[in-house]
């Protein structure tokens, strides 16, 4: 009987704790997209809480610290290691101890302030375990209590005297970063042209506790390559060579490109239309030539295998992409829609006019070597399953719908229907179907041509693919033709219709979301589109992309906290050193999307619903 009573007490205590959590303010969610492998740019957003850290510092120290000192504190929180080194050089040695005292005290205040909305165990997870006892005293106890002022002062002084102050400051800054954002939503394209997508995955897996991915079409290339899609792999290699990023494959994923490099440099010569896009000055002519020739080799192999896939899958409706069989016999012209166009700097020497989509024996040898490496790369498998396990084609979260790309529709807003194996797919169930195919392909990787591989590649560039959202990917035209009209890629009508509230309501209904909800969309949209559309029901976030040219805007991120939603207009990111030198904040401007008259609590969230169900189950045990 005594044990039963003890269990009842434990159940009641759990109910009390869970009920208390429901009354806490809703945590802050950050929505970003199009990371594109740029780790420094990604970290600049994450460390700043997408602008939330500077807002908290302003709220806390307005009237107590000058704007300059607020900036210094914010910059320290973003980049503690670098700023500490710089501060040591700038601070007079006689004033160093006071600087440390002031800095630590301010950071303790910030940690307290940003942790107010969290239960104790969440804050504990964000704090460095090496300083658990110290932070427990400094952060959770009454720092202003008269009887303990000397005690707290002595504790901080000992941190300084024992040369522990630097590492303590760094740990507190990292805690602020984690507590400023409760959940990160990355709405597509962790991977693309950038050199460090592996570091982004590493940061999330080791340093963050609450996040999700909504896959983008560039992510599909990497996931598909791991699943054995040769077409995904060739596109991936071509893009990596185009942006001088082949070293990533070897350094991060232990993929040896020797066979491809030897083949490409023996068969092709550098051409101006395949000149790699390189920003660094420390690139040799040999490296440039390798990038150039590998691009050519991968492009031609890609076109050949694309032709085979398009012929295998008439349901893709991509016959307009069959262009190798439209080349003239001398391969200097191509016929498109009945018109002949001059080829600029062609590299079609391996294309057999009689069988233009046939892979040569030498090409086949290279492809087999590489695809076997991709499917067997331990680190690539680890990272791609991390993306798969923590991601999806779309996410319904806290009455918001998140996805990258589009939900394919016609000009009238009717969902485009796909008929596969006698069944029609459209809208929500089309995205569900593609997610099933992708994960099934990853669970059963094969390097042979198969249904899953073809459909995974289609997600990358297929006509009106939900993750691509255009009528074609004009790779051939952009490489070989000067006609700008032919190079144009038309967006699915989805993007124009996003300006209409009725269309937003239709999308929300299709995914069974309340009409008061929002759609948060990632991807490079139609240029100059307003980021807030459809009476504030659709929000475009593209905060890390380089798509906004000739502008002093670096994109957009979205924050959703207990007070509502606000869109952050971001500064262009040049590099980490520039941010530290200028002490520049990540945010240029803010725009309210939604403001709550009553502050939202955990009870209003999906997590709150989960807690309520847990409380109900516990309460039933007391009956």
Name what the model sees in each region:
Residues 1-623:
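Feature recognizes metal-dependent phosphohydrolase scaffolds
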């Amino acid at each position: 009987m005594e044990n039963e009573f003890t269990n009842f007490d434990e159940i009641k205590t759990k109910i009390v704790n869970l009920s208390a959590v429901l009354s806490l303010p809703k945590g802050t969610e950050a929505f970003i997209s199009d990371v594109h492998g740029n780790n420094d740019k990604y970290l600049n957003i994450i460390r700043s809480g997408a602008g939330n850290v500077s807002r908290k510092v302003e709220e806390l120290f307005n009237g107590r610290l000058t704007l300059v000192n607020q900036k210094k504190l914010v910059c320290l929180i973003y980049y503690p290691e670098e700023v500490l080194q710089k501060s040591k050089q700038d601070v007079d040695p006689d004033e160093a101890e006071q600087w440390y005292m002031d800095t630590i005290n301010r950071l303790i205040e910030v940690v307290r302030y940003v942790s107010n909305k969290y239960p104790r165990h969440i804050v504990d997870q964000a704090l460095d375990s090496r300083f658990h006892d110290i932070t427990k005293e400094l952060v959770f106890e009454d720092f202003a209590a008269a009887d303990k002022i000397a005690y707290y002062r002595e504790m901080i002084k000992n941190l300084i005297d024992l040369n522990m102050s630097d590492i303590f400051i760094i740990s507190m800054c990292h805690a602020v970063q984690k507590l400023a954002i409760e959940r990160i939503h990355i709405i597509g394209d962790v991977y693309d042209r950038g050199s460090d997508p592996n570091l982004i995955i590493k940061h999330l897996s080791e340093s963050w506790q609450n996040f999700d991915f909504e896959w983008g079409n560039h992510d599909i290339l990497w996931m598909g390559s791991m699943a054995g899609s040769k077409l995904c792999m060739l596109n991936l290699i071509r893009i990596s060579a185009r942006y001088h990023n082949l070293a990533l494959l070897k350094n991060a994923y232990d993929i040896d490109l020797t066979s491809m490099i030897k083949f490409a440099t023996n068969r092709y010569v550098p051409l101006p239309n395949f000149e790699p896009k390189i920003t660094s000055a420390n690139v040799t002519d040999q490296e440039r030539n390798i990038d150039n020739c590998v691009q050519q080799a991968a492009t031609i192999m890609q076109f050949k295998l694309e032709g085979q896939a398009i012929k295998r899958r008439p349901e893709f409706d991509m016959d307009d992409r069959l262009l190798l069989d439209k080349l003239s016999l001398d391969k200097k012209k191509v016929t498109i829609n009945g018109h002949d166009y001059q080829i600029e700097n062609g590299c079609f020497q391996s294309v057999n006019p009689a069988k233009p989509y046939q892979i040569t024996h030498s090409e086949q040898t290279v492809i087999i070597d590489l695809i076997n490496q991709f499917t067997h790369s331990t680190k690539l498998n680890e990272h791609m399953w991390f993306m798969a396990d923590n991601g999806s084609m779309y996410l319904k979260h806290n009455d918001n719908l998140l996805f990258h790309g589009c939900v394919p529709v016609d000009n009238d807003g009717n969902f485009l229907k796909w008929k596969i194996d006698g069944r029609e797919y459209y809208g929500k169930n089309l995205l569900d179907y593609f997610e099933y195919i992708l994960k099934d392909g990853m669970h059963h990787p094969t390097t042979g041509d198969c249904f899953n591989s073809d459909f995974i590649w289609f997600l990358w560039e297929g006509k009106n693919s939900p993750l691509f959202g255009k009528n074609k990917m004009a790779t051939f035209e952009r490489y070989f033709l000067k006609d700008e009209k032919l190079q144009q890629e038309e967006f699915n009508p989805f993007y124009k219709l996003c300006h209409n509230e009725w269309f937003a309501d239709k999308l929300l209904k299709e995914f069974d979301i309340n009409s008061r909800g929002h759609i948060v969309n990632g991807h490079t949209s139609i240029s100059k589109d307003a980021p807030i559309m459809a009476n504030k029901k659709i929000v475009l976030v593209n905060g890390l992309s380089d798509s906004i040219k000739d502008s002093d805007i670096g994109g957009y991120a979205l924050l959703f906290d207990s007070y509502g939603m606000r869109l952050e207009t971001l500064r262009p990111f040049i590099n980490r050193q520039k941010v530290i030198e200028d002490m520049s904040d990540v945010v240029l401007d803010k725009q309210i999307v939604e403001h709550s008259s009553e502050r939202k609590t955990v009870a209003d969230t999906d997590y709150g619903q989960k807690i309520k169900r847990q409380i109900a189950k516990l309460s039933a045990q007391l009956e």
